[in-house]
Structure formats: structure tokens, C-alpha cells
């Protein structure tokens, strides 16, 4: 069975096209996810315009901010069932013996490969996902919002974990992109006074940020 996919097939600018790809085969610790929604990250655009700084395993299906329904499970997968609504983390391949992985910082594992550049991502119908990457999505939460889980985590890490804001702090966010707006939202949840600064071209985004 084949499905349409958004494929980044070469390092040259504009090397993205729709291709037919085979349905992925899963390993014993993987699930097969039927994709419902997938976000377009700035890194997807950078690969399209060929101004990225990371190694890409061409050809590769783009997309790493995604969610969907489990449609098949590997033989060693527990705690999940077909039909479960989930989102995925981005670290598709990690070394379990890496010091970073062992300390819980698997996102900093030097051998890490992410969806959309290291392995096939989710801009297609089906994607193979390690079960360790999954997080459950409540029934009342739409996938359009659930697919913002990864950028929300970026904002949480920046604002809550690293900046350690306190109620009453005053914060300026430079740039009303997705991450900037989410950082502003996190800062407000921490009790800070927040201002977002942008350019004239950002007027629509600043309106959204309000």
C-alpha cells in the first residue's frame, strides 16, 4: 500500500515534492501511526529553502510535529492499543547507552536522529514511531492543538526550566512567531508581565498574540 508524502529529496533549494511511498514496516517496539494532523515547523521550511545547518538523510519525508491514531503495534509494545489518540516526541532514534540518554537528556544524544531529517516524518498518511516517543491525547483536545505539544515543550523549557521566571517579572519576547507567542504565553502563566516586539511585517502575528 502506498501513500502520498511530502519528500525532501536533495540538498538543493526547492528539492521538495509529493511522492508515493510504501506503508512503513514497524519493529517490535514501534507503533504504526495514522497521521491526523502535522505542523509545519521553521526547520521544514529551512530544508525546503536549503539554508539549514544540520545533516539530512535524503530522501526523507518532512514533518515532526504530529499526532494521530495508533493502527498497529509491535510485539513488545505495552500500555497502548489500536485507536489510541497520541502525539509523538521528535527523537526517533537515540542511543540508549549514550551518557546523555542515561541522564535523561536524550535530546542531546550526539547520535540522535529526528523525524523529518534523520528518518521519515509525518507529512504522509502513516509513520513508524517508537512507542517510547508517545504521549496520550485527551478526547476533548483537538489534534490541531495537540500537534503544538512539541513547540509548547520548547517554550516551557526556555521559559520555565531555564529562565525560572517568577510572578511579577517583566519579560520582552523578540519576535511573534509560533515559539515566541508560546514563550509569551508560558511567561504569563508564570505570572510575568509580558510584551512582544515585532516588525511591521509581523502585524498579523502580533494580532494573534493579543
Which sequence ranges carry the predicted segments?
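Cytochrome P450 core scaffold surrounding the K-helix E-X-X-R motif
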Residues: 43-49
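Glycine-rich beta-strand-centered segment in the early N-terminal region that forms part
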Residues: 24-38, 51-97, 138-140
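Cysteine-cluster motifs in flexible loop/terminal segments that predominantly coordinate metals
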Residues: 41, 80, 90-135
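Short structural boundary motif marking the start of a folded domain
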Residues: 1-6
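Cofactor-binding loop segments of dinucleotide-utilizing enzymes, especially the Rossmann-like FAD-
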Residues: 10, 36, 73, 176, ...
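Glycine/charged-rich beta-loop-alpha catalytic/anionic-binding loops adjacent to active sites
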Residues: 133-143
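Mid-domain Rossmann-like dinucleotide-binding core that forms the NAD(H)/NADP(H) cofactor-binding site
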Residues: 141-210
